[in-house]
Amino acid sequence: MNSQVSARKAGTLLLLMMSNLLFCQNVQTLPVCSGGDCQTPLPELFDRVVMLSHYIHTLYTDMFIEFDKQYVQDREFIAKAINDCPTSSLATPEDKEQAQKVPPEVLLNLILSLVHSWNDPLFQLITGLGGIHEAPDAIISRAKEIEEQNKRLLEGIEKIISQAYPEAKGNEIYLVWSQLPSLQGVDEESKDLAFYNNIRCLRRDSHKVDNYLKFLRCQIVHKNNC
C-alpha cells in the first residue's frame, strides 16, 4: 500500500517537473512577435508578454533565493540592506485600486521605464558575479538568461504600446541605478551587500511588472471581465 502511494507521489512530482520544464522551454523559444512587422493580434501579444514577464520574475526569485542561501549568513547582514530601491523614486501604483486610476498608456510607459532600467544592473551583475568567490553557476546562468529574456520583454511592451497607444510612444522615464558603483567595491562584504540589494530590487520590480501586465491584459483585452 505504502509503495503504491509513494509511486503515485513520485509520478505526480515527475509530471510537475516535466510541466515546468516544458513551460520554460516554451517561454524561451516562443517569439514575442510572429513576424518582422509584428502583426500579432493584441490579445495574443499580451498573453506572450505576460507569460514572459512571469518567467522573468520566477528567474529573479530563484536567483535571490540562491544568493540568500549562499551569502546571507545572519539577520545582521539583512539589517544592513538598504530599504529603498533605485526605482523607488518612480511613482507606481501600490495595488489594483491605485492602478485603476492610472491611464493604461501611462502605466505601460511606467512598465517600460522599469524594464529599461534593468539593463545596466543586469550587465553589472553578470560582470561582477564572475569575480565573487565561489559564485554558484546557477546564479550566473539565471542572470544571463534574464538579460536575454529582458530584451524580448522590452520588444513586446513596445509593440503593445505601438498597437494600442501609438501616440504614447517615447513617453517613458529613464532611470539610473545609483548603487551600481558599489558592485565594483574592494571590500567583500560591501560587494555582497550591493549584490543582495540589487537582486532584491530587481526581484521587487519584476513582481510589479508582472502584476501590472496581468492587470492591463484584464483591463484592455478582457474589458475588466476577469
From Swiss-Prot:
Domain of life: Eukaryota
Keyword set, alphabetical order: Disulfide bond, Hormone, Lactation, Phosphoprotein, Secreted, Signal
Coiled-coil parts of chain: none
Stored PROSITE patterns: SOMATOTROPIN_1 (PS00266), SOMATOTROPIN_2 (PS00338)
Entries under SUPFAM superfamilies matching the protein: 4-helical cytokines
Gene Ontology cellular component terms for the protein in this record: extracellular region; extracellular space; secretory granule
Subcellular location: Secreted
Modified residues (Phosphoserine): S53, S117
Gene Ontology MF terms in the entry: hormone activity; prolactin receptor binding
InterPro entries named among the record's database cross-references: 4_helix_cytokine-like_core (IPR009079), Somatotropin/Prolactin (IPR001400), Somatotropin_CS (IPR018116)
Stretch forming the signal peptide: 1-29
Any Gene Ontology biological process: negative regulation of nitric oxide biosynthetic process
Keyword Signal found: yes
UniProt subunit comment: Interacts with PRLR.
Function: Prolactin acts primarily on the mammary gland by promoting lactation.
Family designation: Belongs to the somatotropin/prolactin family.
Listed name of the protein: Prolactin
Originating species: Rattus norvegicus (Rat)
